[in-house]
Amino acid sequence: MVCVTDQNNETTSQNRADKLPKSWDPKAVEADLYQGWVDAGYFTADPASDKPGFSIVLPPPNVTGQLHMGHALDHTLMDALARRKRMQGFEVLWLPGMDHAGIATQTKVEEMLKETEGKTRYDYDREEFIAKVWEWKQEYGGKIGEQMRAIGDSVDWSRERFTLDDGLSRAVQTIFKKLFDAGLIYQANRLVNWSPVLETAVSDIEVIYKDVEGELVSIRYGSLNDDEPHVIVATTRVETMLGDVAVAVHPDDERYKDLVGQTLPHPFRDDLSLKVVADDYVDPEFGSGAVKITPAHDPNDYALGLRHNLDMPTIMDKTGRIADTGTQFDGLTREEARIKVREELAAQGRIVKEIRPYVHSVGHSERSGEAIEPRLSLQWFVKVEELAKMSGDAVREGDTTIHPKSLEPRYFDWVDNMHDWTISRQLWWGHRIPIWYGPNDEIICVGPDEQAPEGYVQDPDVLDTWFSSALWPFSTMGWPEKTPELEKFYPTSVLVTAYDILFFWVARMMMFGTFAAKETPELLGEGKDGRPQVPFTDLFLHGLVRDEHGRKMSKSLGNGIDPMDWVENYGADALRFTLARGANPGVDLPVGEDSAQSSRNFATKLFNATKFALMNGAVSEGLPAREELTDADRWIVDLLEQVRLDVDAYLDNYQFAKANEELYHFAWNEFCDWYLEIAKVQIPREGTSAQGENTQKVLGHVLDALLRLLHPAMPFVTEVLWQALTDRTSIVVASWPTAADTNGGVAVDADAARRIGDVEKLVTEVRRFRADQGVKPSQKVPARLDFVACDLQDLEDSVRSLVRIEQPEDDFAASASLEIRLSQATITVELDTSGTVDVAAERKRLEKDLANAQKELETTAKKLGNEAFLSKAPDAVVDKIRGRAQIAQEEVERINKRLEELA
């Protein structure tokens, strides 16, 4: 081993190796490294900089929450982009923040008050309760920030925002008034998702669907005499018949042709009658071909009711109890009424058939757990037609590019078919709707710098959380004021998010972003060709993180993974690299403990390789002259340049998985497994040599660039190793590798690449042959082969070292041989393994291996022969089992062949 002497107290490679710990322990360094980056101001953006701007806004996590695996993926990819752009010389603003999460936060605080004080929010006035929420936010709202630091987010903490900050509240009031004045906000009675427990409308994303065992009940409307007008309808919600106003049939259904236009009496309500209407919505082949219509409590019925101008009586109050029907059922809960109404109908002889159990999908409140009630309610809405068109045009015209392009149709499907958006919520926590009502039923919208007239009362509702989130890209930079941040960093460069909130958040940001730009181009800039400016020029949509079997992570399955557990057990780099290495655009990502362990092992491999290189004199001082390099030297620096080109192309197109997979393969399979092993031969054990010094420079040169390329995905381990290698301040502010940092931009040496390729094949085949012969890996054996014939004479020492073979003596007698086809010739390798193999022990070992291989073959064959497994298991799992079966079959054949040879 060569150690550079420490003359004149200069820092040497050995000194730097000594600074590294004995082994890689991420927990010992990550927190201090991160705080050092923050303290140094590396993440703080300067709007006055003359560097080109690059900006990302963090999709704001709920203040109530903790980071889950989806967040971890989001943050890893955004951080990788931010770190790379910073290294490329951009002025980077990655702006963090949190969402006030109206329903989630209010629910959390109400639960806390019930547990600690035995009170509900109604025991306080509105201002007192909101003060309680702010207290809770101050005490518990910092959890996510701590977790973001733990995974290494390079965000600008000096610009952290909260959706209820004063500046953002001003933006909300401003956009609301502009939309209202433009006639794009209105109030109406519409069907909404209603939570009887929370007593508010909720958004679609806050509704989760569960399979529920119910009963399908067939009811007879009209006469009980078969010869007189009647119809039979089926429902799982018998109680809603209290609000039935019609029965619908298909226009072409001959069975009901004479009934269309007639009315049937309601079994319980004299104030309602059931009109028989014809509508194409009805499937005449399903059931009886007749459908009961409850316009105020079913989305499809509501749409049909609008088409036929039907009455829409609401039969439930805000708590979900039957109300205002004038029947004996008033005051009952939905569940109680379901039983009582069925009993009364049965008593009248109107229950024709019951199917129990009947499994059907029912929407439930994500926050409170009860079944959602579709309910006609007076709410505020955004008229989306004009806004949605601008959003669609922005993508169609290329102002915003969606990655991957394959998800464009999904985006267009949403924006082209969007319904008006319910924006009011019956909560106390959130942005209060800036509508005021006068004493004579006047309605005015009050802007941020205006006061309502005396005697006016503000609307009690708050805005949907997504309303303020839709302003996030520009409200966080100071809009509606003119700010240096907007001038430098708007529009944002890219939005990174999962495809599942494409409608809920992304489309709405596009709507409000283009509208705000149209209204205030002097603040947000002009778009292309007279179109409004967009909030982001690129939209990268990644998939969802799933478990290792491809299943959605859920509490019911118990398969969720806490990313903080991985940080604790494997380190932040392992978490990040696992996610980055699996992040293909728009494709779901399965992960498991094996993935994290593999990434941790990779970090350890990098650490050990760098420490070994430093102990062997690696220096980052630039490359020697090209002609002074060996084949192996030229091959590795040329390969590094190809990897750099590929990684740049991949990352420019958000192909994170391909970029990191290529870096992994290069680092582990090419640099560590091959070049480091050859370098051991090229660096003399004692003394120095020109070739050895050149190899030390190549080692340092390649590691320097490799660590910088890996830094966006693995910031912590690369920082520690790069500082040790280069003795410089921080890799965070190092430059991103260019051709000058790889092979100097010269033409690739194809001959060197060919010869190293031959070495890899030769060594691999000889190693495999040795193993088949039962020769221990450490055992040297004499061997004869013609290095000149295969043009590998300059690499003979490396080959002999790598495969543990010695020069043959004069009396050499081969006991085994193999032929290997290389690029220039087929070479025969003759080996003398006599005396190196214990035949009895080798047979015993092989028989044990054979038993294991046969057991694996039997296990996989059993699974692949199971039709239930094949039909239910994800394709990736089945393919993995098939791969295992093939490997086991090949192993059985190989071992049997070797046993025959021993016999």
Curated annotation (Swiss-Prot):
Coiled-coil segments: 836-903
InterPro entries per record: aa-tRNA-synth_I_CS, aa-tRNA-synth_Ia, Anticodon_Ia_Val, M/V/L/I-tRNA-synth_anticd-bd, Rossmann-like_a/b/a_fold, tRNA-bd_arm, tRNAsynth_Ia_anticodon-bd, Val-tRNA_synth_C_sf
Keyword flag Ligase: yes
One GO BP annotation of this record: valyl-tRNA aminoacylation
Keywords recorded for this protein, A-Z: Aminoacyl-tRNA synthetase, ATP-binding, Coiled coil, Cytoplasm, Ligase, Nucleotide-binding, Protein biosynthesis
EC number(s) recorded for this UniProt protein: 6.1.1.9
CDD domains: Anticodon_Ia_Val (cd07962), ValRS_core (cd00817)
Subunit annotation: Monomer.
Protein name (Swiss-Prot/TrEMBL): Valine--tRNA ligase
Gene behind this protein: valS
